């Protein structure tokens, strides 16, 4: 249930009928004084300062303050402007139901986590089986390539041996021919020595032919070098290298929205998504771009109603698309956070903020 009140210099006493959660303090629309305005609250006999606002500098402040029902609260302003406070009543009955729902959600998330672990183990086993199958296929391909190369080498060797044997056979034939003509050298008896000179001439001619002809037969040895070319089929390894290079290309998981907000899902939730105007619970840690932590809520979830500007715009936009159980890193530019004024002293002006947010609950 919505609650609002205007506070000025005159103290205002108020006793809430239900637990009260104050979320926002801002200067009135008719504020004119440029001096500092400090919002103070008196509770349990003690006075506390909630925030300090200044016209044209810090006109708005996000609060997270709770007051118990039935306990008197006194608000006042130290300054000349009026400050508007807004928040909502927290119904105790609704809080108990929500607490029960959170416990149920935790149990369901535990069961879902176990199922996801089992599924993850099955997927890991499937991936290992696939990797082993791929390795077996690669080994089979390598073995086939080795067998093909061995077969080519065997064929080349057989061809070379056949050609070598053919050349040797041709040489032997050429060498045998002069030996068969050698009987011509025998001189018939009782013949003049002049006639015996003729066979010698014949022998010289035959010897010249035998010495010249083998050189012509050596030329067929050239084709023996050509069969070496079948080793080229090894080149198909290039597409494999290209495929490996393509796998190494990085893929970015950061999403940039038109508003300038960036988010990266660290864990994708499996629960329901928030609805506008409904209360959500988140655990978070906020850092500046230099890594300095300025705020966090890791033990107790921070609760707010999404989509109605109870928090900075970067949260309304970044949390709206999450699911319960999800974890997301939000990089929020200054215009979606605290703008030019910042939130001194922890957040400087024009600061880009980085939040690691976990959505733990959302009302449906």
Curated annotation (Swiss-Prot):
Residues 94-148 have a biased composition (Acidic residues). Keywords: Chaperone, Isomerase, Nucleus, Rotamase. Its main location: nucleus. Pfam families: FKBP_C (PF00254), NPL (PF17800). It is found in: Nucleus. Residues 168-184 have a biased composition (Basic and acidic residues). Its EC number is 5.2.1.8. It comes from the Eukaryota. Residues 92-148, 168-239 are annotated as: Disordered. GO terms for cellular component: chromatin; nucleolus. GO terms for molecular function: peptidyl-prolyl cis-trans isomerase activity. Gene3D superfamilies: 3.10.50.40, Nucleoplasmin core domain. Residues 277-363 form the PPIase FKBP-type domain. Residues 185-239 have a biased composition (Low complexity). It catalyses: [protein]-peptidylproline (omega=180) = [protein]-peptidylproline (omega=0). Inhibited by both FK506 and rapamycin. Binds to histones H3 and H4. PPIase that acts as a histone chaperone. Histone proline isomerase that increases the rate of cis-trans isomerization at prolines on the histone H3 N-terminal tail. Proline isomerization influences H3 methylation thereby regulating gene expression. Belongs to the FKBP-type PPIase family. PANTHER family: 39 KDA FK506-BINDING NUCLEAR PROTEIN (PTHR43811:SF19), FKBP-TYPE PEPTIDYL-PROLYL CIS-TRANS ISOMERASE FKPA (PTHR43811). This is FK506-binding protein 4. It comes from Dictyostelium discoideum.
